[in-house]
Amino acid sequence: MSDEKKKGSAASAMPTAMAPPGLINKEDIPQVLPILPLRNSVFFPGGVLPLAVGRQKTIALIKDAVRDDQVIGVVTQRRAEEEDPGAADLYTMGTVARIVKLLKMGEDNYSLVVQGLARFRVVELVQEAPYLKARVDAVEDKTSSENVEVEALGINLKKLAREVIELMPELPAAATELVESITHPGHLADLIAANVDVPIEEKQAVLETVDLKARMKLVLELLNRKREILKLSNKIDSAVKGEMSKTQREYYLRQQLKAIKEELGEMGEEEEELDELQERLKKAGLPPDVEKVANKELNRLKTIPAASSEYTVARTYLDWIADLPWAKISEDNLDIENARQQLDKDHFGIKKVKKRILEYLAVRKLKNDMRGPILCLVGPPGVGKTSLGQSVAKATGRKFVRLSLGGVRDEAEIRGHRRTYVGALPGRFIQSMKKAGTKNPVMMLDEIDKLGADFRGDPSAALLEVLDPEQNNTFSDHYLDVPFDLSKVMFVATANQLDPIPGPLRDRMEIIELTGYTFEEKQSIARIHLVPKQLKEHGLSPDHIDITDEALLTLTTAYTREAGVRNLERRIADICRAVAVEVAGGKTEKQTINADRVKEILGPEMFYSEVAERTEVPGVATGLAWTAAGGDLLFIEATKMAGKGGMTLTGQLGDVMKESATAALSYLRSKAEQLGISPNFLEKTDLHLHFPAGSIPKDGPSAGVTILTALTSLLTGIRVRHDTAMTGEATLRGLVLPVGGIKEKVLAAHRAGIKRVILPERCRKDLIDVPDQARNELEFIFVTHMDDVLKAALETPPVGVAGTPGGEPGKEAPLPKPAESAPEVRA
């Protein structure tokens, strides 16, 4: 949308036209004027100004003014960026104007021409909508009896204006004639002030100067300053032209000197550097098209003086060409068993990724020219995604480079800047290839889901070429401007979530999902990796400290509750520091860290099972939720009070979750008699559903069965079993539909000490991905209808509930055999 602003710059090539002053009498100016805010310009009486308008308030103003043939007030804004200016945003002095021409340029854009008539002062704003109106006082020029001084000031003004015009050859000769033709001194001062290139504040000061003599003196100061600036500018311009002539002469002499040195066989340091560069280019193994470009640039470099800035630009470019690994490839370690041992040594679990790397090495062993895979590891923080890249590089015998993409918002970070820009460099991918020194490194693209985008472009769109196996063999960097082959690179991207990654970019990567660890896995990771690492970092040895299995269990259950192991490593580091203090103080005997010693060092337990406490009253149910950091418990609290049938929802809920609550209430009303609830329970009762942790946004359909269970518990007075958690979408007919994130939710239930988990029947297949420990220690109840849910979840099933739970208490549900591509339903 266009703004109300003057067409052209403040100092245009032709002085703004001025109409004769005194076109309106003071008595003819209304006491209340519609106000048109003006940006980046000051409008003077007698001036004729073209304007482009687009703000809705201004469009309404000009339509009314044209229809009623009334004058308007034009007032300059103090800050041009203000979209809806008020009294504080406008200057107090403006110009009465008449609209002399109006053209519609588009649907919401108009062009008009206004003529300045007289000055006015704003007394107060009396209207803000549909546009501004103000009560005003007309202002006339204050003239003194000293006409001789005013006449002298006018002569000086014209003289100074002629000098300024002569210093600006781009102005037409008519500019001088226009200035000479004006006889009215106030009109002359306003004309010059309107056209001289000075800040808006200084122009406004001229407009607000009512005393004619003071105004003319002020304009004289502005003109005099402008004249001095123009003189200095012309002087600098002449000096630059002279310097250019001098540079051209020096270049000619240098070329002659170079020819003389060649004849005498006296090559200088510059020539030796160029010969060395040429030799490096020959050894770089450049492709034919790149070699052609490099030789052309090298020949041009030989003709440029070393002191020239262009010499540095060309030399830097050729250095980049020579240093890139165009043909250097590191040999893959194709020993499958060695790679398996290396991966198992560095990382516990994550079998999917290890399996995929071993598959790649096996195929690479059979087919030598295979392209590098493009993997994307998706999972919560702390599960080992980033560190896995280094392990993959060790296992394959390749170089490792890492690119952190989190917060990158500039497309030039990926493709580089063109060489025309000062300080231009290649993008991060080319820089990383130079750092790796080989054509086939393992390149870790860390936090690819946290790429940004702004006015400088979208980096995720630039990555489409990099991560496309059909295109990245001719990747084009803006700085190099020649194709570079990235097809041999093994890309390993990491992300916490898939949703922020654009669909086309996600489609180019092979997604491998990593989930959280069980307690047993965390203890194994701590014993094998974390404890030895922290002992080494704190200068300790196994002779100083022995952390028992009991202590590790306490750490994983009472002091950390996360999908990964970062906080677990921090707590182990806390214990090591406490022991280090004692060892440094002279204590020599070996210290055994058990559960009591952990509590002594770390203080009170941070986590404990609160499910039983939360669900000890009717109306509270335990649900399961998926988050970017893994799964988590989601408590739902319901209460009732006297009212008129309303339902309040709190906890920062999204639209889908609100609709789930509405559907659950409708289902309960339709089944009230069957469940032993009064059919008219809403007539004198209000319901309130609350989802604790109100600062965290929540959404999704998977809380449907939990909401319905909590409401049923509240209205029947039957408590929900405290050892039971559930997830699933409930329909208006009571059917239970499948949801996603089952593995993460089940692991969250296991971490929290839940014993029974209610799942949709169609999610039975998703338990294949759940670790054996969690699967063996939990009882799974598969349901297809809400009757099954209520019978399994409530301590005493309500009267009239039909159906049976989908599983048998005390038995693990039978699991399907793994399939190559089993469909997975996600909420």
UniProtKB/Swiss-Prot annotation:
Active site per the UniProt annotation: S702, K745
Catalytic activity, EC: 3.4.21.53
Keyword annotations: ATP-binding, Cytoplasm, Hydrolase, Nucleotide-binding, Protease, Serine protease, Stress response
Compartment(s) where it occurs, according to its Swiss-Prot or TrEMBL record: Cytoplasm
Entry-linked CDD domains: RecA-like_Lon
Triggers of expression: By heat shock.
Hydrolase is among the record's keywords: yes
Keyword Hydrolase tagged: yes
Region listing for Disordered, in residue ranges: 1-22, 799-827
Gene3D superfamilies linked: 1.10.8.60, 1.20.5.5270, 1.20.58.1480, 3.30.230.10, LON domain-like, P-loop containing nucleotide triphosphate hydrolases
Main location group: cytoplasm
Binding site for ATP: G379, P380, P381, G382, V383, G384, K385, T386
Limits of the Lon proteolytic domain: 615-796
Enzyme class: hydrolase
Catalytic activity: Hydrolysis of proteins in presence of ATP
GO CC field: cytoplasm
SMART domains (UniProt xref): AAA (SM00382), LON (SM00464)
Domain Lon N-terminal: 33-227
HAMAP family listed in its UniProt record: lon_bact
Function: ATP-dependent serine protease that mediates the selective degradation of mutant and abnormal proteins as well as certain short-lived regulatory proteins. Required for cellular homeostasis and for survival from DNA damage and developmental changes induced by stress. Degrades polypeptides processively to yield small peptide fragments that are 5 to 10 amino acids long. Binds to DNA in a double-stranded, site-specific manner.
Oligomeric form and interacting partners: Homohexamer. Organized in a ring with a central cavity.
Name of the protein this chain belongs to: Lon protease 2
Protein source organism: Myxococcus xanthus
